Amino acid sequence: MLQLKNIVKKYGEGENVVTALNGVSITFRENEFVAILGHSGCGKTTMLNIIGGLDHYTSGDLIINGTSTKKYKDRDWDAYRNHSIGFIFQSYNLIPHQTVLANVELALTISGVSKSERRKRAKEALEKVGLGDQLHKKPNQMSGGQMQRVAIARALINNPDILLADEPTGALDSETSIQVMEILKEIAKDKLVIMVTHNPELAEQYATRIVRIKDGQLTGDSDPYEPDKEDETKEAKKTACFHVIPDSRVTVSE
């Protein structure tokens, strides 16, 4: 479970301080498709970067599976990014002279995984996004939608718990955007997918939860997650199941 508690993020010093996030608190479910919706400069990408450990909060706390990150060292953040998070960027970030297969394998190169295992997992990831027959192409031989699917495969190869997507369809046409969104929707069935977007139609069509942000503050949440209250509800339902209802057919003789 991922939780942000009163997150504040400031840039600059003295009179030049800019507050990008101001008291953001939110809890995410283990598997859901969350769209963070807002205009440019509202703080949504900063929020995504803090969730992914690419940037650090000024105050507040990011809680990962019940553990505070306030005392995290660099190695802890590295482990979190490498094993728990998959990143998908609008610009794809593919290496142009490498094949599709090599680009996806690269995510495992520093993880100590054997070459044969890297190859196997990269092929499986590419098959999941419908590119199992495009392994040896270079990025410049592919369409924008295909390159974004390569980026998704690369993000999946470590089997992360959380997938973070920053405007994943921003550079794509409508038809290709639909293909990418359908893949993300499928992934969200057993992972937490958090997507930053400024496109309300896209968010409403595909996300299971829409979080709105404006001027560094959350202004709306279509399906808030409050684990304590949900636990209470589950417990109440469980208790109700064991409530004994007297049988009116039973009589007591005098």
Placement of each model-derived feature along the sequence:
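ABC family nucleotide-binding domain
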Residues: L2-A207
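Residue-level recognition of short loop/turn positions
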Residues: S59, K214-D215
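Residues at the C-termini of beta-strands that transition into short coil/loop
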Residues: K73, K214, S222
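Conserved short hydrophobic beta-strand within the ABC ATPase nucleotide-binding domain
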Residues: R209-R212
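Conserved beta-strand-loop-alpha-helix hinge in the C-terminal portion
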Residues: Q217-I245
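Long, low-complexity, intrinsically disordered segments
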Residues: D247-E254
